[in-house]
Curated annotation (Swiss-Prot):
One of its GO terms (biological process) is seryl-tRNA aminoacylation. GO terms for molecular function: ATP binding; serine-tRNA ligase activity. HAMAP family: Ser_tRNA_synth_type1. Its main location: cytoplasm. The keyword Transmembrane helix does not apply. Homodimer. The tRNA molecule binds across the dimer. It comes from Rhodococcus opacus (strain B4). This is Serine--tRNA ligase. It catalyses: tRNA(Ser) + L-serine + ATP = L-seryl-tRNA(Ser) + AMP + diphosphate + H(+); tRNA(Sec) + L-serine + ATP = L-seryl-tRNA(Sec) + AMP + diphosphate + H(+). CDD domains: SerRS_core (cd00770). The lineage of its organism: Bacteria, Bacillati, Actinomycetota, Actinomycetes, Mycobacteriales. L-serine binds at residues 227-229, 281, 380.
Length: 418
């Protein structure tokens, strides 16, 4: 949730953020109204309780003759207090609903617009110039015994797959390398739960406009996570952290689940867009004033991992209309996919400022010992989709695929052969 104090002092900035996202700026006025109503309800309730307390003293000091009338007045006042408390609860509920309807405030400098309005910050590496007709990742995966979509569909349905043989080793090796790099950079490795409570899913901002993307186990009222960002954000919910020595960094290795409800007909071939995949995700808690620098560090660590798999990629500054509700700024790294003649997302790193931590009650103590809301950030370090870029960019004319040097010790071979 956004900071209500900031909203009261800078309503136009929040309206502009809504416009940058392509969302309704009128929601800002609705929140301001709900905030004013709740504050008025609190004041009215406080005044009535003060009056009730003073009246109680008066009753205690009254003569026997005066007391019956005063007691009657006390009952009337108690009824008014009860009514005021009900109004206060109602006003708080209305405020909470209006508050949750507003997305995080987009950072200055982020481009406005939608999915296609990103800004390319840098392009890295040479696009391969094949002297043969390249195969796509699925054709390579099937011919080399790495990917089995047919049996995945037989067992689980569309957008499921088996990684087999060296395909499984390629993923495990990639994730293991990511884990090693994360630990070398000061992250604590975590294997988190992949089922979370509704308040944790809501706290991270995933139960908003895109909640239909999430698998829900209704009988247990638990949600399957689409990223380990969710349980890692909930890890310190309701806590006050010690950030005196710098950010707290965690790297979560988990299976992730997405319904892809809004992706009918998109990327139906292969493993680019699937219901289940594995990922190593970086997650950071830090002081708000350190968040921008931490965001750049997360991006640098992602780029270091991309350098290890040796694929051409570009870095983009994602437009406001393509940000998730929790993100104030997001940078994506997109790898070149030769058979699509396009760049496709491999990593994403988001600065969520204090938005998630405010919902989840994650705080730290400032230099005066006063609790303040922390900032949270996240970033992809490796995921199943990377196999697409590795296979397509490192394929050879004889149908084999060269394994990136950094992955050879994990995979157990330097060339993937039929």
């Amino acid at each position: 949730m956004i900071d209500l104090k900031f909203l009261r002092e800078n309503p136009d900035a929040v309206r502009e953020s809504q416009r940058t996202r392509g969302e309704d700026p009128a929601l800002v006025d609705a929140l301001l109204e709900a905030d004013a109503s709740r504050r008025a309800a609190v004041l009215a309730g406080d005044n009535l309780r003060a009056e009730q307390k003073a009246f109680g003293k008066k009753v205690g000091q009254a003569s026997p003759e005066e007391r019956p009338a005063l007691l009657e007045g006390s009952k009337e006042l108690a009824a008014k207090v009860k009514q005021a408390e009900a109004g206060q609860h109602e006003a708080q509920a209305a405020l909470d609903a209006a508050h949750r309807a507003i997305s995080n405030i987009v950072q200055d400098g982020a481009p406005a617009g939608g999915e296609d309005d990103f800004i390319t910050l840098e392009t890295v590496g040479e696009i391969p110039a094949f002297d043969f007709e390249p195969k796509d990742h699925l054709e390579l995966g099937e011919s080399l015994g790495l990917i089995d979509m047919e049996r995945g569909a037989k067992v689980s349905g569309a957008r499921f797959y088996f990684l087999t043989g060296f395909g499984a080793m390629l993923q495990l090796g990639m994730l293991q390398l990511a884990a090693q790099k994360a630990m070398a950079n000061g992250f604590q490795m975590m294997i988190p739960p992949v089922l979370v409570r509704p308040e944790i899913m809501a706290g991270t901002g995933f139960l908003g406009a895109h909640s239909d993307e999430i698998y829900h186990l209704a009988d247990d009222d638990l949600y399957l996570v689409g990223t380990s960002e969710v349980p890692l954000a909930g890890y310190h919910s309701g806590e006050i952290l010690d950030l005196a020595d710098g950010p707290k960094r965690y790297a979560g290795w988990s299976t992730c689940f997405r319904r892809e409800a809004g992706s009918y007909g998109k990327d139906t071939r292969g493993i680019i867009r699937v219901h289940q995949f594995d990922k190593v995700e970086m997650f950071t808690y830090c002081k708000p004033e350190d968040a921008d620098a931490e965001h750049q560090r997360l991006l640098a660590w992602e780029r270091d991992m991309l350098a290890a798999i040796d694929v051409p990629y570009r870095v983009i500054d994602v437009a406001g209309g393509d940000l998730g509700s929790s993100a104030a700024r997001k940078f994506d790294c997109e790898a070149w996919v030769p058979t699509q003649q396009a760049y496709r997302e491999l990593t994403s790193t988001s600065n969520c400022t204090t938005f998630q931590a405010r919902r989840l009650g994650v705080r730290y103590r400032d230099e005066n010992g006063k609790p303040q809301t922390a900032a949270t950030l996240n970033g992809t370090l490796a995921t199943t989709r990377w196999i697409v870029a590795i296979l397509e960019n490192h394929q050879q004319s004889d149908g084999t695929v060269r394994v990136p040097e950094a992955l050879v010790p994990f995979v157990g071979t330097d060339v993937l052969k039929p």
